[in-house]
């Protein structure tokens, strides 16, 4: 796949054009990812509501029926449930690693086996997320790509 970029002052917002001979999985993935860049999730920090972009979120988890979104520097709370956020962010590269947690695969730095034989996903912010057995195949596949 080739990438051409052209910076031009006449464009007020970025445009993405795709040229392809055949619709492949890779083409579909690029399309879904580009479309996901315009998605925002409203989330609360202290007394303010912010619009978070998927690219800023490292992982999302539910604790005691509350949904938390973790970025590099803050933890936000969302009124949405994890399942609805997961469906919204699937094209943006979010994958489930536990019943109550999804991670941004683009923030996944490495995987390691912990002392008690659990697999941990290590994110770019040095956060270690335990992956439960039923989701190991999915995260291994995401890591291999």
What are these regions (language model features)?
Residues 1-145:
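Basic, polyanion-interacting recognition surfaces, primarily
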